[in-house]
A protein has these predicted regions:
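N-terminal carbohydrate-binding/catalytic regions of secreted carbohydrate-active enzymes
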Residues: 42-168, 337, 341-378
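Aromatic-lined glycan-binding groove of carbohydrate-active enzymes
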Residues: 52-72, 222-334
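Acidic/polar low-complexity flexible segments
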Residues: 408-413, 417-419, 496-521, 549, ...
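Loop/turn elements at helix/coil->beta-strand transitions in domains of secreted/extracellular proteins
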Residues: 54-60, 147-152, 179-186, 211-213, ...
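Surface-exposed, glycine/proline- and aromatic-rich loop segments on solvent-exposed faces
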Residues: 416-525, 575-584
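Aromatic-rich peripheral "rim/lid" segments of glycoside hydrolase catalytic domains that contact
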Residues: 176, 349-422
Length: 608
């Protein structure tokens, strides 16, 4: 009897283990504690506003691997491997065709590219890149990890798997993971010719056991957002299927919602469920829908505003969708989307409207993307709304998943002496981390006429910062991966400070600490400057510092920060060129933390 109970218990335990999903992404750099304020003045919430991090909540995002896989100047069938199509040497390419630029140049008679050719709706911040650009993939891994995205879901809905590109992404993610990064897992979404696509995907990726540690598992098995009907038993049993397509209300595919995960839906979105129809499993959140349905980024309260009233960067549609998702509070939020960027040009008359205006056969339309308003990408763009959607997404993710609290201490035990030995920093309580190995050079072909994108701006890999407060001073520590060139404080290394009591100044900061252009003896001076406008700084003092090898320490008298308020935000940035725009934090040199993010420190009330 005891043996029977033991066997039953073991089987029950094994069953429970088999139901486990992949762990949620937990940033080793504690990115969920970082502060940021976007170009619209919207600040990210922290633990006090969203509560503690919930390790049972998941976020996935639609990710696209097709950029360059269907040709450049004209549409082509994929090459046999379904990877990025090599460019022909010596060919005079005309693309990329950017619809927004085409319309700006010839609004009445747009000079589009050929029919069926892929057109960009706008320019990505990292340029018209190809999907196998490792430098871009690394930036995507960093941005999505910092945002708290648990899984990227590759779009293979058009019966093309793009396996070489998926493998390139996994190769980069795996390398970053070995460097100590937390990276999103991967999954796929199928639709057209789903049996053929799933068999190809299974044989080329899963059956071979490739990058198994990157597979996203949902309740015991690798997740496949697709249709299990008609598949061989071996494949049908291998995956946990969740059928996915567009819209829900009155849609036959969605039915009652059991095991259905839509990738786009009208507000208020319906949720998919698994065990119980009263227990939401998944809901979708999208930034917009389609130009041919006239549902853009500004659509809200049930209608699309007239053209002279849209505000594409404000995220009204996205905000409504997040509102619904947070009310439903499912296990999994699926976001559409990250980096689609292109759409085919059609003239066959299948669409009857574009942006609410009637069109007839022979006139141009684009189904999924058209311009800044009628597009769905969250990845930052060049110009336009910049990175607004990236931070709006993070706002929603934090409200859904929560965030870790900041370290608070009445007294920091460390006592700092600027002597270049750095042992006194070992007891510092406030330690801040950045990603290791994120200053690799870029040299990769771009789309069509763009021969190559290059970037060699990275020089000092910023790894760790510390902060110690006393009654009179704030002391900062920085460690880099390698020693500073020449053993001296480099030009271009800057510590930016933002206090909670003053309006933001240049680049959103009130003060900056950097090397002066003046040198006394052999040692460069360190100065603190105050922002006097959005573009101008004025020096207010010189500061003491010590530098040895790959470590730097400096102290700042609180006299220079009058009325700082309750908190301080700070950021280290290093590049050969000056940072003149917050967007340059994305691709110039290295920043700690990344992009617009800042580390946040709660000032000790006993020391204020």
């Amino acid at each position: 009897m005891h043996r029977l109970i033991l066997i039953t218990s073991c089987l029950f335990s094994a069953c429970l283990c088999a139901q486990h999903s992949s762990p949620t992404l937990i940033s080793p750099q504690k990115a969920d504690t970082w502060a940021a304020t976007d170009a619209l003045g919207r600040s990210l919430p922290g633990n006090a506003e969203v509560g503690d991090l919930d390790k049972e909540k998941y976020v996935g995002i639609f990710y696209f691997t097709w950029l360059g896989a269907h040709g450049h100047d004209k549409h082509s069938s994929p090459i046999q491997s379904e990877g990025v199509m090599p460019k022909e040497a010596g060919k005079d390419y005309k693309s990329p065709y950017d619809i927004s630029k085409i319309l700006a140049e010839h609004p009445d008679e747009p000079q589009y590219g050929p029919e069926l050719a892929f057109h960009h709706w706008g320019e990505p911040y990292f340029g018209y890149y190809l999907s196998d650009d490792e430098w871009v993939i690394t930036r995507h891994a960093q941005l999505l990890s910092d945002a708290g995205v648990d899984v990227i879901v590759f779009d293979v809905t058009n019966a093309v798997v793009y396996l070489p590109i998926a493998l390139k992404i996994c190769t980069v993610f795996s390398r970053l993971q070995q460097q100590g990064w937390a990276v999103p897992k991967v999954a796929f979404l199928t639709n057209t010719r789903h049996v053929e696509t799933t068999e190809k995907l299974y044989a080329g990726f899963y059956e071979r056991g490739l990058y198994e540690d990157l597979w996203f598992r949902w309740k015991g098995k690798p997740l496949l957002m697709g249709n299990p009907e008609g598949l061989p038993t071996e494949i049908a049993r291998f995956f946990n299927f969740r059928r996915s397509w567009a819209w829900t209300e009155g849609q036959e595919w969605f039915g009652d919602g059991k095991d259905k995960w839509p990738w786009i839906d009208h507000y208020p979105q319906n949720y998919g469920w698994h065990d119980n129809p009263d227990t939401p499993e998944q809901i979708v959140v999208s930034t917009a829908q389609h130009p041919i349905s006239n549902i853009g980024r500004s659509f809200h309260h049930g209608s699309q505003p007239p053209a002279d009233s849209i505000d594409s960067g404000a995220g009204w549609f996205f905000a409504e969708q997040w509102k619904r998702a947070l009310e439903v509070d499912p296990e999994f939020v699926f976001i559409t989307g990250w980096n689609e960027w292109v759409a085919m040009r059609f003239t066959d008359g299948r669409a009857k409207e574009i942006m609410g205006k009637p069109i007839k056969k022979g006139e141009t339309f684009f189904v999924d993307q058209y311009n800044e308003e009628f597009s769905r990408d969250i990845e930052p763009m060049k110009g336009g709304f910049g990175d607004n959607y990236y931070y709006q997404m993070i706002d929603g993710i934090r409200k859904f998943k929560g965030a870790r609290p900041l370290v608070q201490s009445a007294v920091d035990p460390a006592r700092i002496i600027l002597d270049g030995s750095f042992n006194d920093w070992d007891d510092a309580l406030h330690v801040y981390h950045d990603h290791t190995g994120d200053i690799t050079d870029r040299h990769h072909p771009g789309w069509g006429s763009i021969d190559a994108y290059t970037n060699a701006s990275g020089r000092n890999d910023l790894l760790e910062s510390r902060l110690v407060e006393t009654n009179d001073t704030l002391s900062f520590y920085l460690r880099t991966a390698a020693g500073f060139s020449g053993g001296q404080l480099p030009h271009g290394l800057t510590l930016y400070l933002k206090t909670s009591q003053t309006p933001p100044g240049a680049l959103g900061y009130d003060y900056r600490i950097m090397r002066s252009s003046v040198t006394i003896g052999e040692d460069p001076q360190l100065i603190i400057e105050k922002a006097v406008s959005s573009t101008r700084w004025t020096q207010i003092a010189t500061l003491p510092y010590a530098l040895t090898g790959n470590e730097l320490e400096l102290s700042l008298s609180k006299v220079h920060l009058p009325n700082p308020g309750k908190s301080l935000e700070f950021k280290w940035a290093d590049a050969k060129e000056s940072f003149n725009d917050p967007m340059s934090f994305y691709d110039q040199g290295d920043c700690a933390p990344n992009a617009r993010f800042n580390y946040r420190y709660l000032l000790n009330s006993n020391n204020r």
